[in-house]
């Protein structure tokens, strides 16, 4: 369980103060450890009783974060977080029959906002459906729990992270609380140059990425805007850029000189000939349901029966019916990337090993779908990442794009410069 203090009135200023304080603490730590003998820490584990909020003595609101264990119900997680039984009963009695509150994904987090009086005020978590992750936000007003989410409540803030690798890059990033989707996206961005798992002790990672906040609580991560990896003394940089002509399709990653960063492991083929991108990867407010959703892939609008092609060489690992995805094909490629092609009307005869460009199925509207389209996903270690960063061709920058890219890159690089020379830092920039 993790507890995060929060001052709602001064949250914006608190974030700035947090950035400064952590930088100062990092600098103080470096100064204090020079010329002293390092003491080996001892790990002590002790099972503690469940947290009781009532006598905490905390006078301001704070967030409690609890991880979902296999087989947990929402009531189980809320009880473990310390919420009073009568509050849990009110929530389960009102919302216990709703599907998105019955099915929780193991290892996801449930966040509870606790007021200064020790009572629960809000509950937030994401459900995990095929192709979408939906924000469930419960808020207590006038003693009554209600579902709540709106554009006005959602804020996107750029986040800076700087990490020095100790034993492993993934472990060091996780300990610095870099979200798993950012860790896997980073792995894919530089896959053409090096493996993230190949970083050694003393190597460094500096990141600038978008974070999504709901009522002041970070609930999700967006795109990596810039990344800098120092590997064996050599610095590798990547900058996100989206031109106007790409519209809703998302951007791509280029090095500091505006060159295509990598060949993406042979992903040089679009999965189909399409008319438009009807829904890009990322978070959006559902226009009808008025809930925040992460769309875990890219939707391509195309006529029924349009051939769908493997986007790179690989091995078909699944072909059949897959829940809300309808008829789907999954292909495992090099560098740990897996692609998924959903809502197909029919399959081709392809099986086993396939070549990039080989037809694997045909556009349809099976599963949870409102019309013919292809839902295309890219995953690394099972984690959905933006396909444009790892599993779609990267266009060369035009002369007009190069000027715009240079200006955008200069701003991002100035933010990364704040992190150079600091071992570990966590900060916000707005």
Swiss-Prot record:
Record's subcellular location: Cell outer membrane
Domain of life according to the entry: Bacteria
GO cellular component: cell outer membrane
Swiss-Prot/TrEMBL induction comment: Expression is up-regulated in response to transient exposure to H(2)O(2).
InterPro entries in the record: Cell_wall_metabolism_enzyme, Dup_hybrid_motif, NMB0315-like_N, Peptidase_M23
Cofactor(s) annotated in UniProt: Zn(2+)
Record annotation: effect of changing residue 373 to A: No effect on colony morphology nor sensitivity to H(2)O(2), but reduced peptidoglycan (PG) degradation. Altered colony morphology, increased sensitivity to H(2)O(2) and loss of peptidoglycan (PG) degradation
Keyword vocabulary terms for this entry: Cell outer membrane, Cell wall biogenesis/degradation, Fimbrium biogenesis, Hydrolase, Membrane, Metal-binding, Metalloprotease, Protease, Zinc, Zymogen
Post-translational modifications reported in the UniProt record: Likely to be synthesized as a proenzyme. The cleavage of the N-terminal domain is probably required for the activation of the enzyme.
Entry EC number(s): 3.4.17.-, 3.4.24.-
Co-factor binding details: Binds 1 zinc ion per subunit.
Classification via Pfam families: NMB0315_dom_I, Peptidase_M23
Phenotype for residue 299 to A: Altered colony morphology, increased sensitivity to H(2)O(2) and loss of peptidoglycan (PG) degradation. Altered colony morphology, increased sensitivity to H(2)O(2) and loss of peptidoglycan (PG) degradation
Disruption phenotype: Altered colony morphology, but not cell morphology. Decreased type IV pili expression. Deficiency in natural transformation. No sensitivity to cell wall targeting antibiotics. Susceptibility to killing by human polymorphonuclear leukocytes (PMNs). Increased sensitivity to PMN-produced cationic antimicrobial peptide LL-37. Increased sensitivity to reactive oxygen species (ROS), however, the survival of the bacterial cells is not rescued in PMNs defective in producing ROS. Survives as wild-type in PMNs deficient in production of reactive nitrogen species (RNS).
Notes on activation and inhibition: Peptidoglycan (PG) degradation activity is completely inhibited by zinc chelating EDTA and phenanthroline.
Protein's GO biological process: cell wall organization; proteolysis
Binding positions (Zn(2+)): 295, 299, 375
GO molecular function term, any single one: metal ion binding
Entry's transmembrane regions: none
Function per UniProt: Has both endopeptidase and DD-carboxypeptidase activities. Degrades cell wall peptidoglycan (PG) to allow consummate expression of pili. Degrades N.gonorrhoeae and E.coli PG side chains in vitro. Required for proper piliation, which in turn is required for normal colony morphology, resistance to H(2)O(2) damage and defense against killing by human polymorphonuclear leukocytes (PMNs). Involved in type IV pilus biogenesis. Involved in resistance against non-oxidative killing by adherent CXCL8/IL8-primed human PMNs.
Family note: Belongs to the peptidase M23B family.
Assembly with partners or alone: Monomer.
Protein's UniProt name: DD-carboxypeptidase/endopeptidase Mpg
Species classification: Bacteria, Pseudomonadati, Pseudomonadota, Betaproteobacteria, Neisseriales
Gene: mpg
């Amino acid at each position: 369980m993790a507890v995060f203090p929060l001052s709602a009135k001064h949250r914006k200023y608190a974030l700035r103060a947090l950035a400064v304080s952590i930088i100062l603490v990092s600098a103080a730590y470096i100064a204090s450890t020079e010329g002293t003998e390092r003491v080996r820490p001892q790990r002590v584990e002790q099972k503690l009783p469940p947290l009781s909020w009532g006598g905490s003595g905390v006078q301001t609101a704070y967030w409690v974060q609890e991880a979902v264990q296999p087989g947990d119900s929402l009531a189980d997680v809320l009880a473990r977080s310390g919420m009073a039984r009568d509050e849990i009963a009110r929530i389960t009695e009102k919302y216990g029959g709703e599907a998105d509150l019955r099915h929780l994904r193991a290892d996801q987090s449930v966040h509870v906002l606790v007021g200064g009086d020790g009572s629960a005020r809000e509950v937030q978590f994401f459900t995990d459906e095929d192709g979408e992750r939906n924000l469930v936000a419960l808020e207590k007003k006038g003693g009554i729990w209600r579902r709540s989410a709106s554009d006005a409540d959602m804020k996107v803030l750029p986040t800076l992270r700087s990490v020095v690798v100790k034993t492993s890059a993934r472990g060091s990033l996780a300990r610095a609380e870099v979200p798993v989707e950012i860790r896997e996206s980073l792995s894919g961005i530089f896959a053409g140059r090096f493996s993230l798992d190949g970083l050694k002790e003393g190597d460094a990672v500096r990141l600038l990425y978008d974070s999504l906040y709901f009522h002041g609580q970070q609930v999700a991560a967006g795109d990596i805007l810039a990344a800098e990896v120092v590997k064996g003394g050599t610095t590798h940089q990547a900058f996100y850029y989206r031109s106007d002509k790409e519209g809703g399709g998302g951007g791509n990653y280029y090095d500091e000189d505006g060159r295509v960063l990598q060949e993406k492991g042979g992903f040089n083929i679009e999965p189909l000939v399409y008319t438009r991108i009807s829904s890009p990867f990322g978070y959006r407010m559902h226009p009808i349901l008025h809930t925040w959703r992460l769309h875990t892939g890219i939707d391509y609008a195309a006529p029924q029966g349009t051939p769908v092609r493997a986007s790179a060489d690989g091995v078909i690992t699944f072909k059949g019916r897959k829940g809300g995805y309808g008829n789907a094909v999954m292909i495992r490629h090099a560098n740990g990337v897996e692609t998924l092609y959903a809502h197909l009307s029919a399959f081709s005869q392809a099986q086993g090993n396939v070549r990039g460009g080989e037809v694997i199925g045909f556009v349809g509207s099976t599963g949870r779908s409102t019309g013919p389209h292809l839902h295309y996903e890219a995953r690394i270690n099972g984690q959905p990442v933006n396909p444009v960063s790892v599993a779609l061709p990267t266009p060369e920058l035009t002369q007009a794009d190069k000027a715009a890219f240079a200006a955008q890159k200069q701003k991002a690089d100035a933010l990364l410069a704040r992190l150079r020379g600091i071992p570990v830092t966590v900060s916000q920039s707005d």
